[in-house]
């Protein structure tokens, strides 16, 4: 696991234990099972008019960039991004480094119809049950921070609750691991988690290794119409785009430009 992942997970453990004390796992699981089924995340990740589907990411900050959007209004953003053509939304719920909140996702679930991905650093079944309870259609599992056995366990648990899983890989070994464990949505993150640098050629190389029948997602580095088209040429069905949108004066206008609508 990279240094930043270790740091983030260490800070989240105490918070997770407090959440478990307030709402025990059994109760959270019942909430998850009682929650209404939302739109399918996987089904939404289909190309439209030649463009990869856009998973628009709502985040106020990141470890690499600091505060990206000081005037962060998630209740307004989710609706604006849906109307601008987002196929799905990725909602950061990690509090310390991304300044996210589970409440942002829960609120978005009442305002939009497109599927919601819980973007967090997930290593415990509780987080998955909570995601389902607050309105997520999918969760992110990061190969770099999970053993193959743990990945497989969490993947199966998410599927048992009707959640899709975006399985994130940074290299060939991680990609092979998630595919061997049944991943049907494979995401490639070309960010070096030690230096925070981006190398989009990593995305292009790894996406071509994902077999047919598995949804292919470019998870980082799409910062222009040109890189979106490069992702498409490499076989991407979808692209997750956050910083480009959140740093724009109008995220909705920026999304329309990305899709070639403006």
Write out the residue ranges for each language-model feature:
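An N-cap/entry alpha-helix motif that binds or orients negatively charged groups
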Residues: 2-69
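N-terminal small/glycine-rich loop or linker at the start of catalytic domains
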Residues: 44-66, 101-108, 152, 204-212
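Active-site mouth loops of central-metabolism enzymes
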Residues: 55-73, 114-123, 164-169, 217-222
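Glycine/Thr-rich beta-alpha phosphate-binding loop at enzyme active sites
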Residues: 58-71, 80-99, 176-205
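Conserved anion-binding
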Residues: 113, 117-201, 208, 212
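Catalytic cores of alpha/beta
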Residues: 123-134, 170-181, 218, 222-241, ...
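Catalytic-face loop-and-helix region of soluble metabolic enzyme cores
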Residues: 185-241
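C-terminal helical cap(s) of enzyme catalytic domains, especially alpha/beta-barrels
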Residues: 205-209, 232, 245-262
């Amino acid at each position: 696991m990279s240094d930043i992942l270790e740091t983030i997970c260490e800070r989240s453990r105490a918070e997770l234990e407090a959440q478990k004390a307030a709402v025990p796992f059994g109760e959270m699981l019942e909430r998850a099972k009682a929650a209404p089924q939302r739109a399918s995340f996987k089904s939404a990740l289909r190309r439209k008019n030649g463009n990869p589907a856009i998973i628009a990411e709502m985040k106020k900050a990141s470890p690499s960039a600091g505060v990206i959007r000081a005037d962060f209004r998630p209740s307004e953003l989710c609706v604006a991004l849906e109307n601008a053509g987002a196929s799905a939304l990725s909602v950061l719920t990690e509090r310390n480094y991304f300044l996210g909140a589970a409440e942002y996702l829960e609120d978005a679930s009442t305002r939009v119809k497109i599927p919601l991905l819980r973007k967090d650093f997930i290593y415990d079944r509780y987080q998955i049950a909570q995601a389902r309870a607050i309105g997520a259609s999918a969760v992110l599992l990061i190969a770099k921070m999970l053993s193959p056995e743990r990945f497989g366990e969490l993947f199966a648990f998410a599927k048992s609750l009707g959640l899709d899983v975006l399985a994130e890989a940074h290299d060939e070994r991680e990609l092979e691991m998630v595919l061997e464990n049944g991943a049907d949505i494979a995401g490639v993150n070309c960010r070096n988690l030690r230096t925070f640098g981006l190398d989009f050629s990593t995305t292009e190389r790894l996406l071509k290794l994902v077999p047919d029948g598995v949804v292919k997602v470019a998870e980082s580095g799409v910062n222009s119409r040109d890189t979106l088209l490069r992702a498409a040429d490499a076989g991407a069905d979808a692209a997750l785009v956050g910083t480009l949108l959140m740093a724009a004066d109008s995220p909705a206008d920026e999304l329309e430009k990305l899709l070639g609508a403006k």
